[in-house]
Curated annotation (Swiss-Prot):
This is Large ribosomal subunit protein uL10m. The gene is MRPL11. Keywords: Mitochondrion, Ribonucleoprotein, Ribosomal protein, Transit peptide. PANTHER family: 39S RIBOSOMAL PROTEIN L10, MITOCHONDRIAL. GO terms for molecular function: structural constituent of ribosome. It holds the Pfam family Ribosomal_L10. Belongs to the universal ribosomal protein uL10 family. Component of the mitochondrial ribosome (mitoribosome), a dedicated translation machinery responsible for the synthesis of mitochondrial genome-encoded proteins, including at least some of the essential transmembrane subunits of the mitochondrial respiratory chain. The mitoribosomes are attached to the mitochondrial inner membrane and translation products are cotranslationally integrated into the membrane. It comes from Saccharomyces cerevisiae (strain ATCC 204508 / S288c). Residues 226-249 are annotated as: Disordered. It is found in: Mitochondrion. Its main location: mitochondrion. Component of the mitochondrial large ribosomal subunit (mt-LSU). Mature yeast 74S mitochondrial ribosomes consist of a small (37S) and a large (54S) subunit. The 37S small subunit contains a 15S ribosomal RNA (15S mt-rRNA) and 34 different proteins. The 54S large subunit contains a 21S rRNA (21S mt-rRNA) and 46 different proteins. InterPro entries: Ribosomal_uL10, Ribosomal_uL10-like_sf, Ribosomal_uL10_bac_type. GO terms for cellular component: mitochondrial inner membrane; mitochondrial large ribosomal subunit; mitochondrion.
Length: 249
């Protein structure tokens, strides 16, 4: 039996909250929970805003290859729209976050359900991203790892001055500070690096082939010479040996 209940602004998918459904021109926001599925045991009510936000941060972190943390300082509505558009042009998405709830997610991110009940000693209080959540914070997320997108993003944020300031990032499984981010933006893309690696491997394999052919030629020469010597009559071999010894004198 499927029970439906309308909600104020979000909808769960696969047990976790996701984006609202759009049907025609009407945005219907609802919550559906099947009795056949095991219910989640969360600290806050399943239909609460806090549970929704923690689920949102879980989705951002698990589905983004690159996530940048920025100070979001006193942007006007016009500036907010402007920079969201510029960031979107680089392939990214700007999301304002609530630090206290993002901290909950980070401390519990190693658990199956970050919204669930957990003892204090089981939480990760040394998560490397926790120090970044100081003051008004936003994230800029990218689905793929691409240093060129980072270079474009930093160029966009330069015009924002201190209103949008990068303070750190997580690129795949590595946490980067500002210095490492500036180094990362100069790297080639993955396809370029793969192409360079293929070229190096081809070069090395070519050198190996030359050496193999040289060694094979030398081995073949020695084998043929030995076989030829064995086929000669003993007298010829002795005379040849005497001639070689005289020549050496």
């Amino acid at each position: 039996m499927l029970q439906l209940r309308f909600m104020p602004g979000w909808v769960p998918r696969n047990g976790f909250f996701g984006l609202k459904e759009t049907i025609g021109t009407v945005h219907k926001r609802f919550y559906a929970l099947a009795s056949e599925q095991p219910s989640r045991k969360t600290v806050k009510p399943l239909d609460s805003r806090k549970t929704f936000l923690i689920d949102t941060y879980k989705h951002l972190m698990e589905n983004s290859s690159m996530i940048f943390f920025v100070h979001y300082n006193n942007l006007s509505k016009t500036e907010d729209h402007h920079f969201r558009f510029k960031i979107k042009q680089t392939g990214g998405k700007l999301t304002k976050v609530r630090n206290n709830l993002f901290e909950v997610y980070l401390r519990n991110s190693h658990l199956p359900d970050p919204c669930g009940f957990v003892k204090r000693k089981e939480q990760n209080w040394k998560h490397p991203l926790l120090p970044l959540l100081k003051g008004p914070t936003a994230t800029i997320t990218y689905e793929d790892t691409n240093p060129q997108q980072v270079a474009k993003l930093l160029k966009v944020l330069q015009s924002a001055q201190d209103k949008l300031m990068v303070i750190g990032a997580k690129v795949e499984n590595e946490v980067l500070n500002v210095e490492k981010i500036n180094t990362f933006k100069t790297l080639p893309t993955k396809p370029e690096m793969q192409s360079q690696l293929v070229s190096v491997l081809q070069m090395l394999s070519g050198l190996g082939l030359v050496r193999t052919l040289e060694n094979s030629s030398n081995a073949l020469y020695l084998t043929l010479k030995s076989h030829n010597d064995n086929q000669k009559p003993k007298e010829d071999v002795e005379s040849t040996t005497d001639a070689e010894s005289k020549g050496s004198k």
